[in-house]
Every structure is written in structure tokens, then in C-alpha cells.
Regions:
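Flexible coil/turn and secondary-structure edge motifs
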Residues: 2-219
Length: 219
């Protein structure tokens, strides 16, 4: 399956998608995952999108934050039924944040992965199980050696049904863990696509850069 990102396209295009127009969902290209917002950011390679984020056709969206987004994205791209991915920044206050700003912890954003998936091939519940099993949701603002609010565990949901499923899955996951889960569950706000050099980092560099998964202590 080819989920390659056109880095040059993401870096060189200033995004301004009309709210009424739907771009086709090209594999691996975060530019075309969603309906844009007229007020979306226009910095090349750091293009912001406002809510709502909407896919074309029957596909659905999910946003997961579970530490350094390089390794998280690489693992998600290997899940059958995942159509496209983009790494970016979610859950913060500032508009159009840069990686440097997010890394300083000054914007409130978490490093996150936006996923487009085909629910006929992989359910949201299955993606949630993958989420709980591939990081430590009890470690607060950290994953392994990475420290800071940008590395916190979070699920950003689209609609009441995802919110309900995410909350139920958190309760179920807690039953098997010794320490309390710190994962934030919140409605998806603006998702800001990260700079082009972050997209599909591990795939382009031929290695798994982030030391994931980190396992929580089990009962």
C-alpha cells in the first residue's frame, strides 16, 4: 500500500480551500483530507486548518496524540484500513503554531496524528485499542525520554459517538493498568498540519526514530 506524502507539494502550496469545496483524499497527503476553512493558515509548510474537518465519501477522521508524532504516524500507516495520515498540532490555543513554538510548550498544542480511515476495514474501536496498546497513557506530560505538554496523551474526537467510544475505551483500558490514566479526551478543534519535513518522517528516512511503544505498568 502506498501512502507516500508529496513533501514538495505540502511545503510549497499556500492552502486556502473554500469551505464549500471538497478536495479529493489523496493517500498520505494531509492537504486533501478535509474541507478547509476560509480562515485557514497560509504559511507554506505550516498550513493551518480550522474546524470542521470532513473527509470525502464514507471515510472517517480520527486524531490521536501519544508522544512524538513521527513513530506514532509510522505505526498507524501500517494499520489495514488507514487511508491517509498527516502529523500536526492539536489541542492548543495559538493559531498556525510552528514546531519550535509547540516544543517550547508556549501554545498548549500536543503533537498529534490526523488519520483518515475506512470504517468498513478498520473500526474506530479498533483504532482506540491500537492507541491504548502502543503508548503509556499513565505518564502525564511525557512519553519515554520526551518531556513536555506537547507529548501528552490525548484523543481528539469528531462527534458525540467518537466521544462516547473514546470515554468507554478509557474506562476499559484502566481496568488493566496499575496507575491512573492521564489521557485527555476532548472534541477536535483546529488541527494545524506540521511543517513538511515532519510528514512521514520515518518512512522517508527508513528508520523508526521515536522510541515507541512505551508500556504502562499493568495490574
Amino acid at each position: 500500500m502506498n501512502l507516500g506524502l508529496s513533501v514538495a507539494a505540502l511545503a510549497g502550496v499556500a492552502l486556502a480551500i473554500a469551505a464549500a469545496s471538497v478536495a479529493p483524499a489523496r493517500r498520505g497527503n494531509g492537504e486533501n483530507l478535509m474541507i478547509g476553512n476560509p480562515a485557514c493558515g497560509k504559511n507554506p509548510g505550516n498550513a493551518g486548518h480550522g474546524t470542521p474537518l470532513v473527509t470525502t465519501g464514507k471515510n472517517q477522521l480520527a486524531i490521536f496524540a501519544q508522544g512524538c508524532f513521527w513513530g506514532v504516524e509510522e505505526r498507524l500507516r501500517k494499520v489495514p484500513g488507514v487511508i491517509a495520515t498527516a502529523v500536526g498540532y492539536a489541542g492548543g490555543q495559538a493559531a498556525n503554531p510552528s514546531y519550535e513554538e509547540v516544543s517550547r510548550g508556549s501554545t498548549g498544542h500536543a503533537e498529534a496524528v490526523l488519520v483518515e480511515f475506512d470504517p468498513a476495514k478498520v473500526s474506530y474501536a479498533q483504532l482506540l485499542r491500537f492507541f491504548w496498546e502502543t503508548h503509556d497513557p499513565t505518564s502525564g506530560n511525557a512519553q519515554g525520554p520526551d518531556r513536555g505538554t506537547q507529548y501528552r496523551s490525548a484523543i481528539f474526537t469528531f462527534g458525540a459517538e467518537q466521544q462516547k467510544e473514546a470515554a468507554a475505551s478509557r474506562e476499559e483500558a484502566q481496568k488493566g493498568l496499575r496507575d491512573p490514566i492521564t489521557t485527555e479526551i476532548a472534541p477536535a478543534g483546529p488541527f494545524w498540519i506540521a511543517e513538511a519535513y515532519h510528514q512521514q518522517w520515518d518512512e522517508r528516512h527508513g528508520s523508526l526514530s521515536c522510541p515507541l511503544p512505551h508500556r504502562a505498568r499493568r495490574n
